[in-house]
A protein has these predicted regions:
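Broad phosphate/nucleotide-binding scaffolds in NTP-utilizing and phosphate-metabolizing enzymes
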Residues: 1-126, 130-176
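ATP-dependent phospho-/nucleotidyl transfer catalytic cores
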Residues: 125, 155-231
C-alpha cells in the first residue's frame, strides 16, 4: 500500500491519536478481495487482513486517529461528538491515484465515546457491510468495506452479543459536523480547514471567484443528489 497521510498533517486539536483496542479471539468474517485489489493491497497485506480488520495490526506509515466533530441529534444541538468507536487507520492511494480512507469501526473507546464502550456487534457490522455493497452496486454514494471480523468477545447491548470490527473505505470521512465543531470551538482553524478540504476534494473550486462559495455549492449539490437517490 502507498500511504498519503494528509489528515494527521492538520492541527492536532482536530483529532486524537491512539491505537485500536484489539478484539479477543478475532476470527475472519468476510474479505472483499476485489476492493483490496483496487486499493493495491499486496500479498502480505491480504494475508494479514484479519489482524488489520480486528485492530491487532496497524501501519507504521499512519498513526491511527479519532476525529472530533459536532452536530445535531434528534433535532437538537448536541455539541461535541466525534469518532466514539472508530479510528482512521490509514489514507492510501488506490490504483487510480486517488486517496482513500481506511476507517476501522468498533475499534474501542476514544475521548469522544461519551460513556459508550467503543465496540460494534456482529449483527450491525454485517448489516453495514451488506448495505454498503448494495448501495454501491445501485450507484448510490456510500462507504465500501474491505472486510469484517467477528470474535469471541462479548459486547453487552440489550443482550450479550459478539464483538466485531468493520474496515470501511471512503474517499472522505470529513463530515459537515467537522465544520460545526471548528466554527463553535476553534473558529481560528476554520479558514485553513476549509482550504485543505478544497485542495483535497474539490481543487477545481480554487479557480472560482469565491472558492468557499463554490465548494459549499458543490457539497450541497452532491448531498442533494445522494439523498434523492435514497428515495
Amino acid at each position: 500500500m502507498q500511504f498519503n497521510p494528509r489528515y494527521n498533517s492538520l492541527n492536532p486539536k482536530l483529532y486524537h491519536q491512539q491505537p485500536p483496542s484489539p478484539l479477543r479471539g478475532a476470527k475472519a468474517g468476510h474479505f472483499n478481495e476485489a476492493l483490496a485489489d483496487e486499493l493495491l493491497w499486496n500479498a502480505d497485506d491480504k494475508s494479514n487482513w484479519v489482524e488489520i480488520c480486528s485492530g491487532q495490526k496497524t501501519f507504521t506509515d499512519f498513526p491511527p486517529l479519532a476525529m472530533v466533530y459536532a452536530g445535531h441529534q434528534f433535532g437538537q444541538w448536541a455539541g461535541q461528538l466525534g469518532d466514539g468507536r472508530g479510528l482512521l487507520i490509514g489514507q492510501i492511494l488506490n490504483k487510480h491515484g486517488e486517496t482513500i480512507d481506511l476507517h476501522l469501526k468498533g475499534a474501542g473507546s476514544t475521548p469522544y465515546s461519551r460513556m459508550g464502550d467503543g465496540r460494534a456487534v456482529l449483527r450491525s457490522v454485517i448489516r453495514e457491510y451488506l448495505a454498503g455493497h448494495a448501495l454501491n452496486a445501485l450507484g448510490v454514494a456510500s462507504s465500501h468495506a474491505v472486510g469484517f471480523t467477528t470474535s469471541t468477545q462479548g459486547v453487552q447491548r440489550e443482550t450479550l452479543e459478539l464483538g466485531a470490527m468493520l474496515l470501511r473505505t471512503s474517499d472522505c470521512h470529513i463530515r459537515l459536523g467537522h465544520f460545526e465543531w471548528i466554527n463553535q470551538y476553534q473558529p481560528d482553524l476554520l479558514s485553513e480547514f476549509a482550504q485543505k478540504c478544497i485542495e483535497w476534494h474539490y481543487p477545481e473550486c480554487l479557480e472560482a471567484e469565491q472558492p468557499i462559495l463554490a465548494f459549499a455549492t458543490k457539497v450541497i449539490q452532491r448531498t442533494a443528489v445522494m439523498i434523492a437517490k435514497w428515495q
